[in-house]
Structure formats: structure tokens, C-alpha cells
């Protein structure tokens, strides 16, 4: 088993990566402490892992709550339903929520934990590649609003993150590909060696080679932990983790949450960001081809939805959380392994990019 830490002084916490970490009863019970565990999962993951986890925690009198599977359920409606469940079961501050599932379960559970009785502990047990390499680490919790993704949320760190690579063997191929978009992102913003590794190991990763999986998950979590330790509340450096997301959130909001997977939207968003960087002479045409080529190799989309216009993009981008004083700000690659936050992209440049 691999282990690393997110260093945030008294709120630091470990990340455990390996096979069968979902069965690591000793560590899990240690992090639950004297609390009563409440497992939050969805109706896809529950048949696979819920009973095993309940059996492990039987002496702690656990409860569970199951939500439907899908991005559209990361909402205030389901936030309220989980909160009502906790209240109906007289759950106090000595309650520990366990998020067993992908990014939707993790974000929703974390937001409930942040708000319920002004904050209770929670543990992340991510079961998708995207949540393992990105959303489970760093304390971003949120629900979506019809007018924008992740618009209602809080920064709230978990007690621990348990990443079980075996869960990826039950993940649909489309979901695995979506997770690879976030892995590629880390290579683009921070680590040229990781990007090259992804180019060299496409087949091994798609075959779920254990050594390859542990390598990329560990490296992504390591990068995320380093960035979060320096900029927990996304005032500067952490914003670079949003490469491709300005475009991606516009796609998700316009198309309807769940129509495009988050990773699919991020993949296309990174291609658009690379093309925009090319127009600014920060990347070469060969760089753009290399980026879009790797994204395509992992069976991810590189073209925007045919029904979306430049005005659709601009409408949603004007609500982006990175904006300042009404100016849309983008994360753009300046070279492989480096990105920058820019605020001098005009609406006409966006229109030209989308309409080309």
C-alpha cells in the first residue's frame, strides 16, 4: 500500500492507495474514532461494496443512505434529503459520514458534512478514477445549481482518503476514460514526465495494469496535495488545477448535467485551452496536436457539442467562479508542465475559437 499526506497543519490527513483498501478495517476504524459511521453511496456502488463495508463496521452501529447515480443528483434537493435522514436518526456531531462512490457522492457528502450542525467529520472512499485522482483530495465540496456547476459549496477537508484500485475493475470504460482526462490535466499543468508516461502506457492503463494505475494515482494525488498545501482556498496556485474547466463547466451546464461526463467535458475544454494558447503564441501547432492526440487515444472527445454556439459558452463562462470584476479568466498552458491564469482574453477571441 502507498501512503501520502495532505499537509494542512492540524487538518492534515492521509491518502491510502492500493488494492483492497476498502477492506482495511483497522485504519478505517481508527479514522472514524468514537463517531457513528453513516455511509453515503449510490445505487450503482451499493450492490458492489455496501454490504462488505457495513459488515466491517458492524460493531459501530452504522447506517447508510443511497442516492440515485448521476450528476443531476448532486443538488440541493439531495443535500436536504441526506440532512433530513441524519436528523431523523438523531445524528449528532459524533457522526462520521463515509462517502463511498465517485465525485458526485464525494462532493455531496462532503458538503453535507461541512454544513450539518456546523461541521462533522467525513471520510472519502472514491471508487472512480476521476474521484481518486482529483475530487476526493483537497476539500472542495459542493452541489450544482441549474445556472452553474458547483456554485453552492464549501472548502472542507476529509479525515482520510481510501483509494482502492480494485474498484476500477467494476468501472465502465467510459467512466475510466473520463478519469484519464484529469490525469492528463496533471501532466499538462505540472509534470512533463507524467504526460510522457501517459503517452507511453496507453494500452497498459486501458488494461488496468496495477503498477501503472498505482503510479498515476499516486503522482496525481501527490501533485494535488502539494498544491492544496500551498493554496487551500484557491486564491492563486490552486486555480491552475482548473485547466479546461472554464469551457467544461459551460458544456455541462448547457447540455444538462450528466449528458456529458465531467471528464469528457474537461477533455474537450483542455483542447480548447490549448488552441487558445496557440493563438496567443504560447503553444506550437505541434503542441496542440500532441495534446489533442493523447486525449483522443484515451477515447475522449476533442470537439465541442454540435448544438453549442459561442454565445452559449460566453453565457455560462460569465458565471465562472474564477472571474474577477466581471472579467472571464482562463487557465491556459504556456508550455508542457506549466500553465497560467490569464484575464486578457476577449469575447471576440472566444467566439473565433468556438466558431473556427
From Swiss-Prot:
Residues reported to bind NAD(+):
69-74, 103-107, 127-128, 140, 149
Pathway the protein takes part in = Metabolic intermediate biosynthesis; chorismate biosynthesis; chorismate from D-erythrose 4-phosphate and phosphoenolpyruvate: step 2/7
Q: What cofactors does the UniProt entry give for this protein?
A: Co(2+); Zn(2+); NAD(+)
The family assignment reads: Belongs to the sugar phosphate cyclases superfamily. Dehydroquinate synthase family.
The gene behind this protein is aroB
SUPFAM superfamilies in the record: Dehydroquinate synthase-like (SSF56796)
Q: Which NCBIfam families match?
A: aroB (TIGR01357)
Q: Does the keyword rRNA processing apply?
A: no
Localization of this protein = Cytoplasm
> What broad class describes the main subcellular location of this protein?
cytoplasm
Reported EC number(s) for this entry are: 4.2.3.4
Return the cofactor note field: Binds 1 divalent metal cation per subunit. Can use either Co(2+) or Zn(2+).
Q: What span is annotated as the signal peptide, if there is one?
A: none
Kindly state which keywords UniProt assigns to this record, in alphabetical order: Amino-acid biosynthesis, Aromatic amino acid biosynthesis, Cobalt, Cytoplasm, Lyase, Metal-binding, NAD, Nucleotide-binding, Zinc
What's a single GO MF annotation on this record?
nucleotide binding
- Please name the top-level EC class of this enzyme: lyase
The superkingdom listed in its UniProt entry is: Bacteria
Q: Which GO terms describe its biological process?
A: amino acid biosynthetic process; aromatic amino acid family biosynthetic process; chorismate biosynthetic process
Q: Under what name is this protein listed? A: 3-dehydroquinate synthase
Amino acid at each position: 500500500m502507498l501512503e501520502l499526506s495532505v499537509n494542512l497543519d492540524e487538518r492534515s490527513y492521509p491518502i491510502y492507495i492500493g488494492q483492497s483498501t476498502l477492506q482495511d478495517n483497522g485504519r478505517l476504524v481508527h479514522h472514524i474514532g468514537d463517531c457513528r459511521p453513516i455511509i453515503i453511496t449510490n445505487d450503482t456502488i451499493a450492490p458492489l461494496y455496501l454490504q462488505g463495508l457495513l459488515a466491517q463496521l458492524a460493531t459501530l452501529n452504522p447506517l447508510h443512505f443511497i442516492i440515485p447515480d448521476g450528476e443531476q443528483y448532486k443538488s440541493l434537493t439531495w443535500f436536504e434529503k441526506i440532512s433530513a435522514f441524519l436528523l431523523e436518526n438523531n445524528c449528532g456531531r459524533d457522526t462520521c459520514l463515509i462517502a463511498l462512490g465517485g465525485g458526485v457522492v464525494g462532493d455531496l457528502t462532503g458538503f453535507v458534512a461541512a454544513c450539518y450542525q456546523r461541521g462533522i467529520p467525513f471520510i472519502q472512499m472514491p471508487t472512480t478514477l476521476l474521484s481518486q485522482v482529483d475530487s476526493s483530495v483537497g476539500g472542495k465540496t459542493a452541489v450544482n445549481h441549474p445556472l452553474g456547476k458547483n456554485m453552492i459549496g464549501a472548502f472542507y477537508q476529509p479525515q482520510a482518503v481510501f483509494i482502492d484500485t480494485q474498484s476500477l475493475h467494476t468501472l465502465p470504460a467510459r467512466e475510466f476514460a473520463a478519469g484519464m482526462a484529469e490525469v492528463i490535466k496533471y501532466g499538462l499543468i505540472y509534470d512533463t514526465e507524467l504526460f510522457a508516461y501517459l503517452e507511453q502506457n496507453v494500452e497498459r492503463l486501458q488494461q488496468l495494469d496495477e503498477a501503472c494505475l498505482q503510479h498515476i494515482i499516486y503522482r496525481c494525488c501527490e501533485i494535488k496535495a502539494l498544491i492544496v498545501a500551498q493554496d487551500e482556498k484557491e486564491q492563486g496556485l490552486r486555480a491552475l488545477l482548473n485547466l479546461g474547466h472554464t469551457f467544461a463547466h459551460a458544456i455541462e451546464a448547457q447540455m444538462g448535467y450528466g449528458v456529458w461526463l465531467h471528464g469528457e467535458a474537461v477533455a474537450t475544454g483542455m483542447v480548447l485551452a490549448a488552441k487558445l494558447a496557440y493563438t496567443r503564441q504560447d503553444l506550437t501547432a505541434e503542441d496542440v496536436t500532441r495534446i489533442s492526440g493523447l486525449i483522443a487515444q484515451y477515447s475522449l472527445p476533442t470537439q465541442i457539442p454540435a448544438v453549442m454556439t459561442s454565445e452559449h459558452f460566453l453565457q455560462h463562462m460569465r458565471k465562472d467562479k474564477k472571474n474577477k470584476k466581471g472579467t472571464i479568466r482562463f487557465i491556459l498552458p504556456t508550455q508542457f508542465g506549466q500553465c497560467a491564469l490569464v484575464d486578457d482574453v476577449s469575447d471576440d477571441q472566444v467566439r473565433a475559437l468556438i466558431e473556427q
